[in-house]
């Protein structure tokens, strides 16, 4: 009779198995929560605790905590290593590929640049990541409306925060966080002078939004409208 092959790796009978290893497995399977989401998750858990004697209230609190943990998830990403890649700064669906003038508050002139826009639904991870490695040379916030982020007018009329990054080679890429119908809070943790590596997390938009990426002149988008983008991994274009 053939013997069952020995399981490779830690197990309950293996000296390598430990609570620490089990914890690492859980951490690898469940993405951590972005710090901006912890108060929301905590509020849901507090509601569940306060209503522990009432099933409906307890369930509502746990459901709210779980939903917020999912919305504010901060999954690990592995950026491409090939030089010159410009990656998606957000998860979501490519909704627009065109040419447009960068936000006026960045004072980059009236020259239209290639633009790739990503729409983030409520089910997407809402952290933003640096599209390239380089130095932050400008950050500008402009108040505005809170219209639906999937409309063409959202890029010009909605509240937004623009991040301008200059690569070591001198090329510039702009990522614009655009507020949406439910997104009433834009968080940008990057400041002028910061050095970012491609794929670094720099911000977050709460509850549905849009991300516009302005590419250097001459860059050709490598994605198509309707394609799903993964922040920090999907290559939008290459530096010219």
UniProtKB/Swiss-Prot annotation:
Leader sequence segment: none
Cofactor (UniProt): pyruvate
Residue positions where Pyruvic acid (Ser) is found in the record: 209
Pathway: Phospholipid metabolism; phosphatidylethanolamine biosynthesis; phosphatidylethanolamine from CDP-diacylglycerol: step 2/2
Description of post-translational modifications: Is synthesized initially as an inactive proenzyme. Formation of the active enzyme involves a self-maturation process in which the active site pyruvoyl group is generated from an internal serine residue via an autocatalytic post-translational modification. Two non-identical subunits are generated from the proenzyme in this reaction, and the pyruvate is formed at the N-terminus of the alpha chain, which is derived from the carboxyl end of the proenzyme.
Function comment: Catalyzes the formation of phosphatidylethanolamine (PtdEtn) from phosphatidylserine (PtdSer).
Name the record gives this protein: Phosphatidylserine decarboxylase proenzyme
Lineage: Bacteria, Bacillati, Actinomycetota, Actinomycetes, Mycobacteriales
Gene name of the encoded protein: psd
């Amino acid at each position: 009779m053939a013997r069952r092959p020995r399981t490779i790796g830690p197990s309950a009978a293996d000296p390598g198995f430990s609570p620490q290893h089990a914890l690492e497995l859980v951490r690898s399977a469940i993405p951590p929560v972005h710090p901006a989401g912890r108060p929301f998750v905590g509020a849901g858990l507090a509601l569940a605790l306060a209503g522990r004697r009432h099933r409906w209230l307890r369930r509502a609190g746990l459901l709210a905590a779980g939903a917020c943990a999912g919305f504010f998830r901060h999954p690990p990403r592995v950026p491409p290593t090939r030089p010159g890649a410009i990656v998606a700064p957000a998860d979501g669906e490519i909704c627009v590929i065109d040419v447009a003038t960068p936000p006026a508050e960045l004072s980059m002139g009236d020259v239209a640049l290639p633009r790739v826009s990503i729409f983030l639904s409520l089910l997407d991870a809402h952290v933003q990541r640096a599209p390239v490695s380089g130095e932050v040379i400008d950050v500008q916030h402009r108040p505005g409306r809170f219209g639906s982020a999937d409309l063409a007018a959202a890029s010009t009329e909605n509240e937004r925060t623009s991040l301008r990054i200059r690569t070591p080679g001198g090329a510039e890429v702009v990522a614009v966080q655009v507020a949406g119908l439910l997104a009433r809070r834009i968080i940008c943790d990057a400041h002028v002078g910061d050095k970012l590596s491609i794929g670094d997390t720099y911000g977050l938009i709460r509850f549905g939004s849009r991300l516009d990426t302005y590419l250097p002149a001459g860059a050709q988008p490598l994605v198509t409208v309707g394609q799903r983008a993964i922040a920090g991994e999907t290559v939008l274009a290459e530096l010219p």
